[in-house]
């Protein structure tokens, strides 16, 4: 028989630090450079990235020796409900006894700074920068008026 996902419990202070409900939540809006503080950005703009996705956050955390969980949740300040803007990542910050799970990341801000610094180095981000060359090399139209169509100025027409 297949095992089910453990039932979520309501949060209480008596929960242990390794319970899923005590893990910290990270939404892509927290590290999005295009968001304002009012729209949910948590870090300074110079430390953020443009339009991160929860998949990119997952890719960074998977190599960072942290325990995390993906959830299909929508950020409450996000206006769009499209699938590309959905997603939340829960990260374990502390062990059962309250000690840090990973000494490199003592706070939630340190985890977000690490994620924001590593996302631009992902291969998916490096491939996107090469597309600007193809957009600029569009054919130019000839403005010499020797073509058909009888150039000249056209007025607004008669007012009726």
Curated annotation (Swiss-Prot):
Pfam families: SRP19. GO terms for biological process: SRP-dependent cotranslational protein targeting to membrane, signal sequence recognition. The keyword Ribonucleoprotein applies. Keywords: Cytoplasm, Nucleus, Ribonucleoprotein, RNA-binding, Signal recognition particle. Gene3D superfamilies: Signal recognition particle, SRP19-like subunit (3.30.56.30). GO terms for cellular component: nucleolus; signal recognition particle, endoplasmic reticulum targeting. It is found in: Cytoplasm; Nucleus, Nucleolus. The keyword Isomerase does not apply. Residues 123-143 have a biased composition (Polar residues). One of its GO terms (molecular function) is 7S RNA binding. Coiled coil: none annotated. Residues 122-160 are annotated as: Disordered. Its main location: cytoplasm. Component of the signal recognition particle (SRP) complex, a ribonucleoprotein complex that mediates the cotranslational targeting of secretory and membrane proteins to the endoplasmic reticulum (ER). Binds directly to 7SL RNA. Mediates binding of Srp54 to the SRP complex. Belongs to the SRP19 family. Component of a signal recognition particle complex that consists of a 7SL RNA molecule of 300 nucleotides and six protein subunits: Srp72, Srp68, Srp54, Srp19, Srp14 and Srp9. This is Signal recognition particle 19 kDa protein. It comes from Drosophila melanogaster. The gene is Srp19.
